[in-house]
């Protein structure tokens, strides 16, 4: 098995095409096959080098390794070779309509209730019409056998059929000499022996046309898999939705773990449960294209965030310590295991370091100020450790006649500035006695600890 992921470098990778890449990769790896990365950059006016690098960076970050990679812009001679062959065979023909003329034809056919299929007028041009087009650069179409039925067994959609008479002869070369998507894609799939083509359902009509090109070139037609499109905020996801929220680089920047994204994207739209996975081995071993369905899929950042929290809260110190160094964070193993259950991303450890070592803002009720002052008076005159803090909290509870909650909440606010977090007896030693005393003093007087 050989699959390929073929992005156009006209934007940064988003969750929609990342899902396609992941499924191509999982399918290949589950069958001990190969995964190819093909950069579809034949449209030089829209392709940018920064997007090529961005695609590779995102795939690398997601640990979706490829067995080979190439850019279509390096294979133009090969496309020309096949183009010339088909031109000599009369399968490709030149056309001279302007875009305005084509738009007018399309509009007229739609008004007549007819499918907007190209009328092949370029094949019927008189000598006078040819002279009228003198000086115009031609574009080229590939002639399809319109008497045939195009059928394939899609691994998600089942049997799919098209009547070729309802399909326009595809434009394969523009007036400026550049190729459209259709033609180079098929040439590459043949030359690189692609066995399975996995992509979004918006390519179904393209597949019908491309099967015709495979047949014209007398090549074996690959297996096709068309996945339902991912929706985001009621819009189909594409590189032009205009929201950074769906870009992989954005998810990386806000602290999402690669495995959270992969755990989510690999199972969404399947009959399998979406669960956090520690590594992708389980995803590879459990992958089965038959579990995918045709129902629309809605992307939820909240769902990924929940998976992310569960994954982060299971990370060992060995897996995060180098990241702390890279981020300039001084986080010990003991501190990580203390606050781990209270973070949603690895970066959140910075907040807890700041709580322990920086200024905090508190909002203590007036009714609790006397209580805070009395609690401070009970603090032992010794360095804090977990046992000392437990004994202190127990003594406060006994002398104040307050419930555990009414003891802990104001003390937590006074010493940390937040209402939730790790056990107070375990956290206070990291703040240190002198700072705890200062914060209690400020809180008892209604001041911020700054």
UniProtKB/Swiss-Prot annotation:
SUPFAM superfamilies: An anticodon-binding domain of class I aminoacyl-tRNA synthetases, Nucleotidylyl transferase. GO terms for biological process: glutamyl-tRNA aminoacylation. Disulfide bonds: none annotated. It catalyses: tRNA(Glu) + L-glutamate + ATP = L-glutamyl-tRNA(Glu) + AMP + diphosphate. GO terms for molecular function: ATP binding; glutamate-tRNA ligase activity; tRNA binding. GO terms for cellular component: cytoplasm. It comes from the Bacteria. Its main location: cytoplasm. A motif ('KMSKS' region) lies at residues 236-240. ATP binds at residue 239. Coiled coil: none annotated. A motif ('HIGH' region) lies at residues 7-17. Its EC number is 6.1.1.17. It holds the Pfam family Anticodon_2. It is found in: Cytoplasm. InterPro entries: aa-tRNA-synth_I_cd-bd (IPR045462), aa-tRNA-synth_I_codon-bd_sub2 (IPR020751), aa-tRNA-synth_I_CS (IPR001412), aa_tRNA-synth_I_cd-bd_sf (IPR008925), Glu-tRNA-ligase_bac/mito (IPR004527), Glu/Gln-tRNA-synth (IPR000924), Glu/Gln-tRNA-synth_Ib_cat-dom (IPR020058), GluQ/Sye (IPR049940). Catalyzes the attachment of glutamate to tRNA(Glu) in a two-step reaction: glutamate is first activated by ATP to form Glu-AMP and then transferred to the acceptor end of tRNA(Glu). Monomer. HAMAP family: Glu_tRNA_synth_type1 (MF_00022). This is Glutamate--tRNA ligase 1. It comes from Anaplasma phagocytophilum (strain HZ). The lineage of its organism: Bacteria, Pseudomonadati, Pseudomonadota, Alphaproteobacteria, Rickettsiales. The gene is gltX1.
